[in-house]
Amino acid sequence: MLEVGKKTVRVSLDQALAGQADSPLHVHLGQGLSRGERMDWAIQKATELGANEITPIVSERCEVRLKDERADKRLAHWRQVAISACEQCGRSTLPVIHPPVTLAEWLSSAKADLKLVLHPVAEPLTSHAKPATLAFLIGPEGGLSEAEVEQAKAAGFHAARLGPRVLRTETAPVVALSVAQQLWGDF
């Protein structure tokens, strides 16, 4: 720093560092709204693993209901979680944390080359060709109902499974994003 004033600061730039490149795979995560720290953990890890957009989804089995002021506070909190995760992992761009929406709203607006809904009885994630953009739909505690899975399929989503075990709602995005980055991204 060369000079500090009441309203200004003058600095001299000694060295420019290249920012960490983002993954070539653009990922939009639709994450079922979950209780307490589970949602924080899912957002934190999804940010660290390169998600570009994260949308909390209100679905049939969702146990969390956010209204007005409380929803605004949670959204601000989740955005701070993403900022902290970016600082921790050295990521130079923040993911967009969208306000919570219903499943129907998200399904009608999700745009991606490959849209996947996680389901324990489906083809493996590895059976899909490389996309440039990817949307993942992950259910809340208790999962998505069969009607919701069918609704997602009708909206152009393909059912995919991550393996032989059913994962917790906060674990599924970690595994899904890790596998996607390994297959098609920058791992």
Predicted regions and their residues:
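Conserved hydrophobic positions within beta-strands
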Residues: 1-3
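RNA substrate-binding interface of SAM-dependent RNA methyltransferases
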Residues: 5-6, 10, 14-116
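Conserved residues at beta->alpha junctions
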Residues: 33, 140, 170-171
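Gly/Ser/Thr-rich beta-alpha loop segments that engage phosphate groups in nucleotides
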Residues: 38, 141-145, 165
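A short acidic, often aromatic-flanked loop/helix-cap motif at beta-alpha or helix-coil junctions
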Residues: 101-107, 123-125, 167
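Active-site/ligand-binding-proximal alpha/beta "capping" segment
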Residues: 110-149, 157-160
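Structured adenosyl-cofactor binding patch, chiefly the S-adenosyl-L-methionine
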Residues: 146-187
